[in-house]
A protein has these predicted regions:
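Long, well-structured alpha-helical subdomains associated
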Residues: 137, 149-206
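Auxiliary, metal-adjacent structural segments of Zn-dependent hydrolase domains
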Residues: 13-88
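Active-site recognition of the HExxH zinc-binding catalytic motif
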Residues: 104-117
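Non-Sec secretion/translocation targeting segments of pathogen effectors
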Residues: 1-9, 144
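Solvent-exposed loop/turn segments at secondary-structure junctions
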Residues: 79-80, 96-98, 112, 120-121, ...
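Short pre-active-site segment immediately N-terminal to the catalytic Zn-binding motif
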Residues: 90-106
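Post-HEXXH active-site segment of zinc metalloproteases
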Residues: 100, 116-142
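Extracytoplasmic/secreted envelope proteins and their assembly/folding machinery
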Residues: 45, 104-107, 141, 145-148
Length: 206
């Protein structure tokens, strides 16, 4: 059974499941494969439309080779997680809805896909000590969360709903650190580093 089939088996949703594509732009290759019900496809389409409002996220999706893009699903059985990425499948939990919060979750999980595809650490994970493995995992999580910060900052002025999602995220230390660096006009790598450090400063998370 494929990973995406396993994910679908965990969705616990009613309705006929189909496989198709979900578009995020007008380009020939601006799409992901997906599986789910008509309701799931409608949700994924709405989420990706919001993700694509960020030029950085749009570029990131377009730059990902077609062969490396994960299949998308909406998970209905999760209560303790907003989503996950497992290389061949990226799942967004139904509990996140279809608004900018859900789009930020996608940005987070898609950053994990970028880590799988482009990250050198994955190639040498077998040689890591336990301490190194834990550190690598937490750095990866900090980078993924900062991708969500970057997304929310990019779209915050688009409409009131985006502004609300951004303001809610400011409760997070990492979001505040990233936003402050952006307002200061720092380079994007420095903004990302600030966001990651802000995330790591929260001892409950890192």
């Amino acid at each position: 059974m494929s990973t995406i089939e396993q994910a679908l088996n965990q969705t616990n949703g009613a309705g006929k499941v189909r496989r198709d594509i979900v578009r995020f732009g007008d380009g020939e290759n601006d799409y992901f494969t997906a599986a789910g019900t008509d309701e799931d496809f409608a949700a994924l389409t709405e989420i990706l439309a919001k993700v694509a409002e960020s030029p950085e996220q749009l570029k990131k999706m377009r730059d990902m080779p077609m062969s490396e893009r994960p299949g998308l699903v909406i998970s209905k059985g999760e209560r303790s997680s907003y989503g996950y990425c497992a290389k061949t499948v990226l799942s967004i939990s139904k509990i996140t809805g279809t608004g900018y919060k859900a789009a930020a979750v996608f940005a987070h999980e898609f950053q994990h896909q970028c880590q799988y595809v482009y990250g050198n650490a994955q190639r040498f994970a077998h040689a890591f000590s336990l301490k190194e493995s834990i550190l690598e995992e937490r750095i990866g999580e900090a980078a993924a969360e900062t991708a969500a910060y970057q997304y929310l900052y990019d779209v915050k002025d688009n409409n009131p709903q985006a502004q609300t999602a951004y303001k809610a995220a400011l409760e997070k230390r990492g979001m505040r650190a990233y936003a402050l660096a952006r307002r200061k006009g720092e380079s994007e790598p420095d903004c990302v580093l600030a966001g990651m450090q802000g995330y790591a400063d929260n001892l409950r998370l890192a």
